[in-house]
Amino acid sequence: MERITVTLGERSYPITIAAGLFNEPASFLPLKSGEQVMLVTNETLAPLYLDKVRGVLEQAGVIVDSVILPDGEKYKSLTVLDTVFTALLQKPHGRDTTLVALGGGVIGDLTGFAAASYQRGVRFIQVPTTLLSQVDSSVGGKTAVNHPLGKNMIGAFYQPASVVVDLDCLQTLPARELASGLAEVIKYGIILDGEFFTWLEENLDALLRLDGPAMAYCIRRCCELKAEVVAADERETGLRALLNLGHTFGHAIEAEMGYGNWLHGEAVAAGMVMAARTSERLEQFSSADTQRIIALLERAGLPVNGPREMSAEAYLPHMLRDKKVLAGEMRLVLPLALGKSEVRGGVPHDVVLSAIADCQQA
């Protein structure tokens, strides 16, 4: 069992990583006997895990209600969020309740925002079931729903009480979702840890076949890197923005193509190549390192080009609504070397458009 602490003073919390955690009531600390829980999951995961998690919580004396939401990025919306509020009010649940997010990034983000908002804030626990959510979205307290004009535009910084990563969940993960999660894994190597990037080049095949020790190390290292960044910059005023490598481009793809048509990791993968190409044009990143990124993404089964039906010019309106924009100026996360990156403003639009055009599908 691996345990990592996200250090935020009184709001610090553990990330527990192991196989078989759904069999152990102690995995869901700080829940105690007699407390009330609302389990939030989706219709795909409910048949796989809902009864198991409900059973282990009830074994510990926890009072469990549940709400099952539709599955997909397009349901990460205010309308579906209201479904959670209605379920909480109908039971009813008070300020002493705990929300448990049992699912991937959509469930985690939406449940976290529900917890931040319901009766001005209640406790919640992240139980991520996808690789992407285990290495990224469940850690750090970013919660949100989407708006038709932009991804994650309505949300709050709100930290969980704990994160429970059961490695067994990856056994039921579709191959496309596994690849999507690997995009965020590769991101950490590009922006923060060149040695980890090299490790990924050497061990990607083991990750693709869900080798236990390799996957446990991979998730632990990603969570360590994320925890260090969040502890240093919880509200993304500086260092934490680096975690958005590829996201400014990727969010444009997701919004333009319709949420869910491109998985988040797929869009981020193409976006990371666009960021590398932009950095190349500014003469601060080598084409050889761009090729290493492309090769690793392709081995993971990820796209390295944007959608062919989306012109380079179609990206800009979305990118100019990005949350990193300051005083109307687009700011991009750009790699400087493998393991080193920066947030840069003032990149000429023609440079960005040229990089995007270079990454369009033929």
Curated annotation (Swiss-Prot):
<protein>
    <recommendedName>
        <fullName>3-dehydroquinate synthase</fullName>
        <ecNumber>4.2.3.4</ecNumber>
    </recommendedName>
</protein>
<keyword id="KW-0862">Zinc</keyword>
<dbReference type="InterPro" id="IPR050071">
    <property type="entry name" value="Dehydroquinate_synthase"/>
</dbReference>
<feature type="binding site">
    <location>
        <position position="151"/>
    </location>
    <ligand>
        <name>NAD(+)</name>
    </ligand>
</feature>
<keyword id="KW-0057">Aromatic amino acid biosynthesis</keyword>
<dbReference type="Pfam" id="PF24621">
    <property type="entry name" value="DHQS_C"/>
</dbReference>
<dbReference type="GO" id="GO:0008652">
    <property type="term" value="P:amino acid biosynthetic process"/>
</dbReference>
<dbReference type="GO" id="GO:0003856">
    <property type="term" value="F:3-dehydroquinate synthase activity"/>
</dbReference>
<dbReference type="InterPro" id="IPR030960">
    <property type="entry name" value="DHQS/DOIS_N"/>
</dbReference>
<keyword id="KW-0456">Lyase</keyword>
<comment type="pathway">
    <text>Metabolic intermediate biosynthesis; chorismate biosynthesis; chorismate from D-erythrose 4-phosphate and phosphoenolpyruvate: step 2/7.</text>
</comment>
<feature type="binding site">
    <location>
        <position position="142"/>
    </location>
    <ligand>
        <name>NAD(+)</name>
    </ligand>
</feature>
<keyword id="KW-0170">Cobalt</keyword>
<dbReference type="InterPro" id="IPR030963">
    <property type="entry name" value="DHQ_synth_fam"/>
</dbReference>
<feature type="binding site">
    <location>
        <begin position="129"/>
        <end position="130"/>
    </location>
    <ligand>
        <name>NAD(+)</name>
    </ligand>
</feature>
<dbReference type="InterPro" id="IPR016037">
    <property type="entry name" value="DHQ_synth_AroB"/>
</dbReference>
<feature type="binding site">
    <location>
        <position position="264"/>
    </location>
    <ligand>
        <name>Zn(2+)</name>
    </ligand>
</feature>
<dbReference type="GO" id="GO:0005737">
    <property type="term" value="C:cytoplasm"/>
</dbReference>
<feature type="binding site">
    <location>
        <position position="184"/>
    </location>
    <ligand>
        <name>Zn(2+)</name>
    </ligand>
</feature>
<keyword id="KW-0479">Metal-binding</keyword>
<dbReference type="GO" id="GO:0009073">
    <property type="term" value="P:aromatic amino acid family biosynthetic process"/>
</dbReference>
<comment type="function">
    <text>Catalyzes the conversion of 3-deoxy-D-arabino-heptulosonate 7-phosphate (DAHP) to dehydroquinate (DHQ).</text>
</comment>
<dbReference type="Pfam" id="PF01761">
    <property type="entry name" value="DHQ_synthase"/>
</dbReference>
<keyword id="KW-0520">NAD</keyword>
<keyword id="KW-0963">Cytoplasm</keyword>
<dbReference type="GO" id="GO:0009423">
    <property type="term" value="P:chorismate biosynthetic process"/>
</dbReference>
<dbReference type="InterPro" id="IPR056179">
    <property type="entry name" value="DHQS_C"/>
</dbReference>
<keyword id="KW-0547">Nucleotide-binding</keyword>
<feature type="binding site">
    <location>
        <begin position="71"/>
        <end position="76"/>
    </location>
    <ligand>
        <name>NAD(+)</name>
    </ligand>
</feature>
<dbReference type="GO" id="GO:0046872">
    <property type="term" value="F:metal ion binding"/>
</dbReference>
<feature type="binding site">
    <location>
        <position position="247"/>
    </location>
    <ligand>
        <name>Zn(2+)</name>
    </ligand>
</feature>
<comment type="similarity">
    <text>Belongs to the sugar phosphate cyclases superfamily. Dehydroquinate synthase family.</text>
</comment>
<keyword id="KW-0028">Amino-acid biosynthesis</keyword>
<dbReference type="GO" id="GO:0000166">
    <property type="term" value="F:nucleotide binding"/>
</dbReference>
<feature type="binding site">
    <location>
        <begin position="105"/>
        <end position="109"/>
    </location>
    <ligand>
        <name>NAD(+)</name>
    </ligand>
</feature>
<feature type="binding site">
    <location>
        <begin position="169"/>
        <end position="172"/>
    </location>
    <ligand>
        <name>NAD(+)</name>
    </ligand>
</feature>
